[in-house]
Amino acid sequence: LQQMRFGQRIKYICNATDECLEELVPSFVLQPLVENAIIHGLSNSSEGGLIYVRCWKKNEYMYMSVADTGLGIEHERLMKIRSTIDGVFDSDEFENNNELQDLKSNQKTVGVGLGNIAQRVKGMYDDSGMKVYSHQGCGTIIQVYFNIGK
């Protein structure tokens, strides 16, 4: 649908190893990450950009990443996002995590979609995580990983 909306302004590259295609992955992880890349990274750029979706396995872990060539995230906001996500994965009682509650009450400051994805992955896989890399003006990479061997 987004391809129809933005036409040729946004290009997609998807790369998944064969062994990834055989694994069950948490639902609604990649789709909201791609939507975030479009909405927050590329939609305001007149040139559009590229979204690169990648999936691979290393040892007992499955990795999924979504990268964009968009606007990137301002440093202060990036730090808040990272802190919130780390709070989800570091907390045994992630549903009661104070930073996650702050995230839900202040959706404009920090991306609530990323917090929801972190919760979903943490709920399914104890040994999991999420990393966000971004430089303003250079794009963003969001990587989700989880242990599929447990």
Protein language model features and the residues they cover:
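C-terminal beta-strand of the catalytic ATP-binding
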Residues: 144-150
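Two-component histidine phosphotransfer core
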Residues: 1-131, 140-143
